[in-house]
């Protein structure tokens, strides 16, 4: 497996979106930055908030795009191109409708599953889908017509606790990824379910 050199947390910019389910990826990157003792700063060259962190002796770039979700690839493409980072060296954290709150999973490759952030990243990486994803479960409203309002809404307190617990576990699993490997990180994260 390639070493991860860029970790991206997908989000919509602005205070009105900060606590919405669609920003779960950003919550994970912010927690990772806190653990690493770094602060993300705005960098217009990469259309996002960025930081350089060190995890178990390995350099990694952190990125939260400040474009809207459907333009996330602009930020990812700009940073990846500048630092010559390949898709296999990228981990993108995003909210996942198909997993319940309290569950998170790593995955390599695959489609975008209707997620506009992933869709744009795939397009900007020359249709290369072969990047890693961290899928953070937010649950599904039950009706596909309600998805937009659901992802742009805030989770009730109990659901938010479950999402936060899964993010904490995802951060610990990311440390295992950098210290050991993806298989061990997956084994740990995929056996976790917050109650």
Curated annotation (Swiss-Prot):
GO cellular component, one term: cytoplasm
InterPro entries: Pept_tRNA_hydro, Pept_tRNA_hydro_CS, Pept_tRNA_hydro_sf
One Gene Ontology term from the biological process aspect of the record: protein quality control for misfolded or incompletely synthesized proteins
Protein name: Peptidyl-tRNA hydrolase
Active site positions, chain numbering: 22 (proton acceptor)
One term of GO molecular function: tRNA binding
Reaction equations catalysed: an N-acyl-L-alpha-aminoacyl-tRNA + H2O = an N-acyl-L-amino acid + a tRNA + H(+)
TM regions (residue ranges): none
Keywords associated with the record: Cytoplasm, Hydrolase, RNA-binding, tRNA-binding
Residues noted as binding tRNA in the record, renumbered to the chain: 17, 68, 70, 116
Gene from which this protein is expressed: pth
Functional summary from the UniProt entry: Hydrolyzes ribosome-free peptidyl-tRNAs (with 1 or more amino acids incorporated), which drop off the ribosome during protein synthesis, or as a result of ribosome stalling. Catalyzes the release of premature peptidyl moieties from peptidyl-tRNA molecules trapped in stalled 50S ribosomal subunits, and thus maintains levels of free tRNAs and 50S ribosomes.
Discriminates between blocked and unblocked aminoacyl-tRNA (site feature) positions: 12
Enzyme class: hydrolase
Main location: cytoplasm
Site entry: Stabilizes the basic form of H active site to accept a proton: 95
Summary of subunit composition and partner proteins: Monomer.
Protein EC: 3.1.1.29
Family per similarity comment: Belongs to the PTH family.
Annotated compartments: Cytoplasm
A Pfam family: Pept_tRNA_hydro
């Amino acid at each position: 497996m390639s070493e991860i050199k860029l970790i991206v947390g997908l989000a919509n910019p602005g205070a009105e979106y900060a606590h919405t389910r669609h920003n779960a990826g950003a919550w994970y990157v912010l927690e990772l930055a806190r653990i690493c003792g770094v602060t993300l700063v705005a960098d217009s060259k990469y259309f996002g908030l960025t930081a350089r962190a060190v995890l178990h002796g390995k350099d990694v770039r952190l990125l939260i795009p400040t474009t809207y979700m459907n333009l996330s690839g602009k930020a990812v493409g700009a940073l990846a191109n500048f630092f010559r980072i390949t898709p296999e060296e990228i981990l993108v954290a995003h909210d996942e409708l198909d997993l319940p709150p309290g569950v998170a999973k790593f995955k390599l490759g695959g489609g975008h599953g209707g997620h506009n952030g992933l869709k744009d990243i795939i397009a900007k990486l020359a249709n290369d889908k072969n990047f890693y994803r961290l899928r953070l479960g937010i649950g599904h409203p039950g009706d596909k017509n309600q998805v937009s309002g659901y992802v742009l809404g805030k989770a009730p307190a109990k659901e938010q606790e479950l999402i936060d617990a899964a993010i904490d576990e995802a951060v610990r699993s990311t440390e295992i990824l950098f210290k050991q490997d993806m298989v061990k990180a997956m084994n740990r994260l995929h056996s976790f379910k917050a109650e």
